[in-house]
Amino acid sequence: MKKSLFAALFGAFLFCGMLSAGETPAISIFGDSYSTFEGSIPQGNAIWYFNPPKNNNDVTKVEQTWWHQAIALLGGRLEKNESYSGSTICNTGYNKKDFSKISFLARQGRLGKPDMILICGATNDSWAGAPIGEYKYSNWTAQDLYSFRPALAKLFSDLKQNYPGAEIYFILNSQLSAAINESVHTVCTHYNIPCIDLKN
């Protein structure tokens, strides 16, 4: 994970001029494997970054995670880290399994009382080959939410409704499918949610 790049992007791009001096924003992290760290996410959520490490990755302590560095640069505090390794935004997971209990949609109500929400998702939707679906911004059916586009729209709608005072940002990983990239940009624009595209 591009930890230094993430931190630089957040420091330069997100919070500049947003807060008054002395404010400490409550920041919630909403993600998948790249946003996990053992001891920092709810018990029972699947973990990718363990303490001590198990997966031969280069993250060995929480201070190395992108989100910890970002929060530090923003002068904030962690409100909640609701991240779950392998989770998809929509309710379709790997091998077409039903992920409706662990998807971003299922977990969006667990973010506490944040001033800012940083969402890092869609990677597993791309890698799992989840159905893309059609753009739909209201009247979602249960079946709609097994496809990426309507699920992302429903997710943003729920977040806006449940956290009306929070600034919301979406971080889009690099090397995802063109359909996922296009979908994220389109739905972010519809809901006026800034999207930060990672490179390389």
Report the location of each language-model feature.
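Alpha-helical cap/lid subdomain in secreted, periplasmic
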Residues: F99-N200
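Boundary at the C-terminal end of the N-terminal hydrophobic targeting segment
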Residues: L19-E23
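Conserved SGNH/GDSL esterase-like catalytic core that processes O-acyl groups on lipids
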Residues: A26-S28, F37-Y137, T141, A178
